Amino acid sequence: MTQGQGFGFGLGKMKELAAAIQKAQQVQEGAKKLQEDLEKMEIEGVAAGGLVKVIMSGNQEPRRVEISPDLMSEGAEVVADLVTAAMKDAYLKSTTTMRERMEELTGGLSLPGM
């Protein structure tokens, strides 16, 4: 190694590394809070104009299903189809919410797959 070359890890690089570590810690703390927030959220999926509702958490955990008594005369197959449609609606809303919140959390970072 020639005089003055070192390892190429000077003071500027150390500051960059320290900033990157700090940002990673902030993201980790934010991710923990986000997970807690998602668990507390209630996201509603609907079908048949609200006659069927599926409520799930922000991380896609099913909470409850609400079916209007007016639908019970329609038969099991119709009710099952509407519950499925409401589940899909809730899932889509939940994953969209999760993705948006993750983008907010990781904003400004160059992370693969985000």
From Swiss-Prot:
Pfam families (UniProt xref): YbaB_DNA_bd
GO cellular component, one term: bacterial nucleoid
Single GO MF descriptor: DNA binding
Alphabetized UniProt keyword annotations: Cytoplasm, DNA-binding
Annotated compartments: Cytoplasm, Nucleoid
NCBIfam families: DNA_YbaB_EbfC
Assembly behavior: Homodimer.
Family statement drawn from the similarity comment of this UniProt entry: Belongs to the YbaB/EbfC family.
Protein's UniProt name: Nucleoid-associated protein Cyan7425_0899
